């Protein structure tokens, strides 16, 4: 299985002046935990790291001596463009691909393997978790306009797993039509293609704020004993 890791994270919401994935977390950079899980996942045979050139040397230091092939792919100005470049950088033999946010540093090897198994069976899948809060739809003035049925709501996460040919087609359509999406599953939705959810459990958080770092450190402390 081929894995693309989006690693061009901004530090803006962290109050940091550098890539948040290079901030320390329990003794090593955030991204190192993501890479460790990917390298331990039996299903993953090739990893592409999509990042910005300014971070290239520091990120590649994290995978020196890695037991699997790891390639560097220079990203674009948006996540969508970066993933498109990542798809262009896949080996010719790639049939399926997992897309993963480097900031989801608590993803387990088992989660990568589950997503890999699902996409090999012919399903496009995304890691997700059922929403537990009551969600409100709110207009521009701050007025609540609706309360969606919580039973139908899931928070989309990564890894997201797809056919390489289909996902490339989705990105071509997005470019041609001017679509802007925040995850790759949205391209499938626009094209009317089915995507399934795979329950990732409660710990597959995305590290975005200082509070998220605190939560991630607590989860890692529990895992590591």
UniProtKB/Swiss-Prot annotation:
This protein's record includes keyword Phosphoprotein: no
Keywords, comma-separated and alphabetical: Isoprene biosynthesis, Nucleotidyltransferase, Transferase
Name of the protein described by the UniProt record: 2-C-methyl-D-erythritol 4-phosphate cytidylyltransferase
Pfam family, one: IspD
Domain of life: Bacteria
Family to which this protein belongs: Belongs to the IspD/TarI cytidylyltransferase family. IspD subfamily.
Enzyme class label: transferase
CDD domains in the cross-refs: CDP-ME_synthetase
Pathway(s) it belongs to: Isoprenoid biosynthesis; isopentenyl diphosphate biosynthesis via DXP pathway; isopentenyl diphosphate from 1-deoxy-D-xylulose 5-phosphate: step 2/6
Known function: Catalyzes the formation of 4-diphosphocytidyl-2-C-methyl-D-erythritol from CTP and 2-C-methyl-D-erythritol 4-phosphate (MEP).
Gene Ontology molecular-function annotations: 2-C-methyl-D-erythritol 4-phosphate cytidylyltransferase activity
Family matches, as SUPFAM superfamilies: Nucleotide-diphospho-sugar transferases (SSF53448)
GO BP: isopentenyl diphosphate biosynthetic process, methylerythritol 4-phosphate pathway
Site (described: Transition state stabilizer): 13, 20
EC number of the protein: 2.7.7.60
PROSITE patterns (UniProt xref): ISPD
Catalyzed chemical reaction(s): 2-C-methyl-D-erythritol 4-phosphate + CTP + H(+) = 4-CDP-2-C-methyl-D-erythritol + diphosphate
Keyword Flavoprotein: no
Site (Positions MEP for the nucleophilic attack) residue list: 150, 206
């Amino acid at each position: 299985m081929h894995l693309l890791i989006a690693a061009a994270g901004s530090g803006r919401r962290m109050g940091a002046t550098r890539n948040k994935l290079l901030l320390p977390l329990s003794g090593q950079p955030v991204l190192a935990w993501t890479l460790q899980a990917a390298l331990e996942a039996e299903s993953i045979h090739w990893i592409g790291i999509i990042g910005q050139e300014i971070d290239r040397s520091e990120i590649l230091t994290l995978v020196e001596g890695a037991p699997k092939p790891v390639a560097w792919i220079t990203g674009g100005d948006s996540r969508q463009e970066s993933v498109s470049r990542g798809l262009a950088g896949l080996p010719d033999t790639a049939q399926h691909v997992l897309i993963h946010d480097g900031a989801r540093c608590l993803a387990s090897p088992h989660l990568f393997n589950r997503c890999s198994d699902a996409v090999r069976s012919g399903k496009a899948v995304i890691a997700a978790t059922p929403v537990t809060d009551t969600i409100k739809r709110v207009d521009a003035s701050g007025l609540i306009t609706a309360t969606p049925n919580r039973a139908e709501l899931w928070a989309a996460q990564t890894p997201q797993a797809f056919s390489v040919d289909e996902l490339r087609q989705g990105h071509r359509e997005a470019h041609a039509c001017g679509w802007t999406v925040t995850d790759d599953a949205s391209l499938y939705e626009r094209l009317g293609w089915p995507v399934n959810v795979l329950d990732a459990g409660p710990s597959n958080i995305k590290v975005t704020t200082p509070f998220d770092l605190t939560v991630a450190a607590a989860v890692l402390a529990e895992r590591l004993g």
